[in-house]
């Protein structure tokens, strides 16, 4: 077993028991590592060094300035948890994924850059309501993540084109061609 000794002064436990005052007086920095059975057992420390360390700890615990920031700057507003049905359930119109859905999707191997849009969620819910299948909440979220991954990747990440728009020919001539 490896260990790290935090002082250059090392003494056996027998020597410390025999004459602890002399051992501590000779210790550099007022601290000595005490070994038992060829392994570090504990540290012995002088009262003066202990007082120094406690004063240093107290000084570091105090703030560096008297300016204090408002605590509410650090407090994230807590969202009210949405009641999720226990066990398996069929998809219902008000179903929502968890607030940390993007993080969960990453854990499942689905990298989503943006959260689910209202249109994507409505489409997902409408499809699965019609199917009538039942799954646990986490399984519904996994299905939503996969659905978003496939839907967003199908068009190279671009939004789907509107089938009702009439396309217009490109009127620009590329460089290198005569027009």
Curated annotation (Swiss-Prot):
Keyword flag DNA-binding: yes
This protein's record includes keyword DNA-binding: yes
This protein's UniProt keywords: DNA replication, DNA-binding, Primosome
Location of the region described as Disordered in the Swiss-Prot/TrEMBL record: 156-179
One GO-annotated biological process of the protein: DNA replication, synthesis of primer
GO cellular component: primosome complex
Gene3D superfamilies found in the cross-reference section: 1.10.8.1180
Assigned protein family: Belongs to the DnaT family.
Function as written in the Swiss-Prot or TrEMBL entry: Involved in the restart of stalled replication forks, which reloads the replicative helicase on sites other than the origin of replication. Can function in multiple replication restart pathways. Displaces ssDNA from a PriB-ssDNA complex. Probably forms a spiral filament on ssDNA.
Subunit structure: Homooligomerizes. Interacts with PriB. Component of the replication restart primosome. Primosome assembly occurs via a 'hand-off' mechanism. PriA binds to replication forks, subsequently PriB then DnaT bind; DnaT then displaces ssDNA to generate the helicase loading substrate.
Name recorded for this polypeptide: Replication restart protein DnaT
